[in-house]
Amino acid sequence: MTQTGQKISDFELVAHDGEAVKLSEKLQEGPVVLAFFPAAFTGVCTAEMCEFRDTLKQFEELNATVLGVSVDIRFSLAEFAKQQDLNFPLLSDFNKEVISALGVRDDNFIGMKGVAKRSVFVIKPDFTVAYQWVAENPGQRPDLDEVRKALSSL
């Protein structure tokens, strides 16, 4: 699993709106918060993404870009974003390349293999992981105050 202090590789995924999102391009604007979640339309995932939605301004004030990431297809993510009025990109890692590279692939999620473990990474513009949190179980949600604290220290 990718740890704090390690560098990650660039990647490009398709967002819920069909646009290609490249990590390196987002990092040119400042740090990036990668918020991995197991599946759209599930209770804990919905609550987590809505908490990011409701506090997005606080992340923007820290010059950070928030990107939600799951293995759902972009069409499902588009409907999820619409229904929840999400105001940040949701990226489809349908081929499981990014979750595998970062070591947050869950092969035992209520009988499903290959979903994202609920996790959050703060990535600095030089691709270094400044903060990392991975849920011990999928019912846990990240402490967004801790994420913002990590961003404040950059």
Regions found by a protein language model. Give the residues of each.
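Chalcogenol-based redox active-site neighborhoods
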Residues: 1-154
